[in-house]
Regions:
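Walker A/P-loop
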Residues: 18-37, 149
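SF2 helicase catalytic motif II
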Residues: 114-147
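Conserved Walker A/P-loop ATP-binding site and its immediately adjacent core
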Residues: 31-38, 46-83
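Structural recognition of the conserved hydrophobic beta-strand(s) that form the central parallel beta-sheet
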Residues: 66-67, 144-150
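Conserved nucleotide-binding/hydrolysis micro-motifs of P-loop NTPases
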Residues: 71-74, 107-109, 151-152
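Conserved Walker B
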Residues: 26, 123-125, 151-152
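Conserved pre-motif I regulatory segment
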Residues: 1-23
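Inter-Walker segment of RecA-like/P-loop motor cores
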Residues: 84-113
Length: 152
């Protein structure tokens, strides 16, 4: 079974680029859309997004870091969204040999020296000039990244 995105999600994936902001309402499927973009950036097959059989990405895909709210990290919302992509933070369940980390904005400084990975920044917190912004700027220079936001 494939991933099965809605048409508007496929349209969004096709418009996305490194460094973009994906804006959508609460419950609009931004997380799954972001994972679909990651899937395609790592040699995933577009037909899998339309509901065709899942075709694995090249192995290993880039390490994936998801920086989100502490609540979303603790409730494992992202874990559920990763299931159709056969991704998991648990190496025994993850189909691939890449590293996947889901952490909160409070810990973003731990990742400022990561390079050649893919970051999804959920719930935009990169305005201003504080430590989160400084860490984000360092991460953005050495990695692929996208931002998800429910606020315009």
């Amino acid at each position: 079974m494939g991933i099965g995105l809605y048409d508007y999600q496929i349209d969004a994936v096709n418009r996305m680029r490194n460094g973009c902001i994906l804006n959508g309402g609460v419950g609009s499927g931004k997380s799954r859309t972001a994972l679909a973009y990651y899937y395609l950036r790592n040699d995933g097959d577009p037909s899998s997004l339309c509901g065709d059989d899942y075709i694995p990405m090249g192995d290993p895909p880039k390490d994936l870091y998801i920086i989100t709210t502490a609540r979303k990290r603790d409730t494992k919302e992202w874990e559920a969204d990763m299931v159709p992509f056969l991704l998991s933070t648990n190496p025994e369940i993850n189909l691939y040999s890449n590293k996947i980390m889901i952490d909160s904005w409070n810990n973003i400084t731990k990742y400022k020296d990561i390079t050649d990975a893919f970051f999804i920044f959920d719930e935009d917190r990169v305005t201003g000039s504080g430590v989160w912004v400084k860490s984000f700027l360092k991460i953005a220079k050495s990695n692929e990244w996208i931002i998800l936001s429910a606020t315009p």
